[in-house]
A protein has these predicted regions:
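Short membrane-interface loop/juxtamembrane segments of multi-pass integral membrane proteins
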Residues: 146-150, 190-191, 237-245
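Cytosolic-side membrane-entry/anchor segment at the start of a transmembrane helix
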Residues: 5, 14-24, 142-171
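Individual transmembrane alpha-helix segments
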Residues: 85-120
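Juxtamembrane transition segments at transmembrane-helix termini in multipass membrane proteins
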Residues: 2-90, 124, 181, 192-231, ...
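Loop-to-transmembrane boundary segments
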Residues: 151-160, 242-255
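Non-cytosolic segments of integral membrane proteins
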Residues: 163, 167-188
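Hydrophobic alpha-helical transmembrane segments of multi-pass integral membrane proteins
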Residues: 27, 108-124, 128, 159-172
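Hydrophobic transmembrane alpha-helix segments characteristic of membrane transport
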Residues: 119-149
């Protein structure tokens, strides 16, 4: 057990080192993710401006939170249905996690932005993982070539994972909390007992959800370092690896989850409240941007740590990464090379 913990700890440290060694990739992911949300933010800003106009309510809203206006705007404006008081400060991530646990559907008006962010993640993560596997510079051509190569593979993997997530978030969640929970607490009058049953059901729901998440991430890593074309094969390989190395896999995941919990706690404490003021607006943008950057760094560090753990579990640590993508020559240049090769062969006869 001690050796497994040391190996997992070393993998986590190496994962963070690889992410820190390519800061430009992390910055590109952050810029792409933030940029993908700008259209939705612009639509919301225009809707707020149209709704307020030059009314006296505008000054009240600018100076702080006006819940009466907020309720009116959320019910009247379609782009504002996701614009609720739960987005203020640290309540935003807490509300997101609470909604996930309770099986709430995401607001329809932000689905487009969410899908765009996920597609950008699928595209850029292939190039980032390829860079972490090689541990050397490949240039812009190599990076975006790897992004293009692995995008469609990760897209197929995402569709397979989506089926599993849909079952866990949909029917399985409904059975636990709409069927099992009422039956288990039908004769319970003590609130603490009902809470313990609900906590147990949350655990039973989170275990398969996290397990699928871990397997899919290890499948991504195996697809990159082994240049796998079949995502079913990558999933099977990931399942085998997780089954054979449960302790180090759990430690790598747990250590990065602990870092994520610390970052979340810091954001909850530092995030400004809903009071107005230019400096508070700047603080919201700065702290929110840093929180997003930290979350993406943690996600990449977990993948890089999983990659390190896989490499060290194979025959040798420096596992062969896929070859650098090479752009083909033009047809004219290829014809010249072929003619030269034919002339060389004829002269040697």
């Amino acid at each position: 057990m001690g050796s497994s913990f040391r190996a997992a700890k070393a993998a986590v440290v190496e994962g963070w080192r690889r992410v820190a060694g390519f800061p430009l990739g992390l910055l590109a992911l952050w810029v792409a993710t933030a940029g993908a949300t700008l259209p939705a933010a612009a639509m919301l800003a225009a809707s707020i401006e149209d709704h307020l106009g030059d009314s006296m309510t505008a000054s009240a809203v600018a100076s702080g939170v006006d819940l009466r206006w907020w309720d009116e705007f959320s019910s009247a404006a379609r782009p504002g249905r996701s614009f609720s008081p739960t987005i203020i400060g640290g309540a935003a991530p807490v509300g997101t996690y609470a909604g996930l646990l309770d099986g709430d559907e995401p607001p329809v008006d932000i689905l487009g932005a969410v899908m765009l962010v996920q597609l950008l993640w699928l595209f850029l993560s292939g190039g980032l993982l390829d860079r972490y596997a090689r541990r050397r510079r490949g240039g812009a051509r190599g990076f975006f070539g790897a992004c293009g190569v692995f995008f469609f593979r990760f897209l197929r993997l995402g569709l397979l994972a989506g089926v599993a997530y849909a079952v866990i978030v949909g029917p399985y969640h409904g059975w636990l909390f709409e069927t099992a929970y009422p039956w288990l607490t039908r004769e319970t009058s003590v609130e603490r007992t009902a809470f313990l049953w609900r906590a147990l059901l949350y655990t039973l729901w989170l275990i398969p959800l996290l397990l699928v998440n871990v397997i899919v991430d290890y499948a991504k890593v195996r697809a990159v370092i082994e240049d796998r074309h079949s995502m079913i094969g990558a999933l099977v390989g990931a399942v085998r690896f997780v089954r054979r190395h449960p302790a180090p896999v759990a430690v790598v995941y747990g250590l990065n989850a602990a870092v994520a919990a610390v970052v979340l706690a810091a954001y909850i404490v530092l995030a400004p409240d809903g009071r107005g003021g230019d400096w508070r607006l700047l603080a919201v943008l700065a702290i929110g941007g840093l929180y997003l950057l930290a979350r993406q760094a943690i996600r990449l560090a977990f993948l890089a740590g999983a990659m390190t753990l896989l490499e060290r579990s194979f025959a040798h640590a420096d596992y062969t990464a896929p070859p650098l993508p090479v752009w083909p020559d033009s047809p004219a240049a290829e014809a010249i090379d072929n003619a030269a090769l034919v002339a060389t062969l004829r002269s040697s006869e």
